[in-house]
């Protein structure tokens, strides 16, 4: 299994419950696809350097997980079609 890291920007106008629901959705998706969640780190609301989809702020969260490439691909696919996600980046961590 490979290690991956995803940084996700969520719409800033969500309620706390809805935000937690979005995070849980992706945290639960990883094991469903045969992966393993290593760490979830909520960074909170931060100001963006430039507007993204007409938003100047976003909630950030970091998701570290292990899995096959298909797990990362499915996570990216679901993030692309989610209206609550304004930007994301999934990268494979280097082996050390």
Curated annotation (Swiss-Prot):
What are the protein's UniProt keywords?
Ribonucleoprotein, Ribosomal protein, RNA-binding, rRNA-binding
Q: Cellular component GO terms, alphabetically?
A: cytoplasm; ribonucleoprotein complex; ribosome
A matching Pfam family: Ribosomal_S6
Biological process, per Gene Ontology: translation
What Gene3D superfamilies does the record point to? 3.30.70.60
Please give the Gene Ontology molecular function terms for this protein.
small ribosomal subunit rRNA binding; structural constituent of ribosome
| InterPro entries xrefs | Ribosomal_bS6, Ribosomal_bS6_sf, Ribosomal_S6_plastid/chlpt, Transl_elong_EF1B/ribsomal_bS6
PANTHER family attached to this UniProt entry: MITOCHONDRIAL 28S RIBOSOMAL PROTEIN S6, SMALL RIBOSOMAL SUBUNIT PROTEIN BS6M
Q: What does this protein's UniProt record list under function?
A: Binds together with bS18 to 16S ribosomal RNA.
NCBIfam families in the record: S6
Cross-referenced HAMAP family: Ribosomal_bS6
Q: What protein family is recorded?
A: Belongs to the bacterial ribosomal protein bS6 family.
Name of the molecule in the record? Small ribosomal subunit protein bS6
């Amino acid at each position: 299994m490979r290690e991956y890291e995803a940084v996700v920007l969520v719409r800033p106008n969500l309620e706390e419950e809805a935000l937690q629901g979005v995070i849980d959705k992706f945290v639960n998706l990883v094991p469903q696809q045969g992966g393993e969640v290593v760490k979830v780190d909520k960074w909170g609301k931060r100001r963006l350097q430039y507007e993204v989809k007409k938003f100047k702020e976003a909630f950030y969260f970091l998701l570290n997980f292990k899995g096959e490439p298909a797990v990362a691909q499915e996570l990216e696919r679901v993030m692309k079609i989610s209206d609550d996600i304004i930007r994301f980046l999934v990268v494979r961590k280097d082996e050390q």
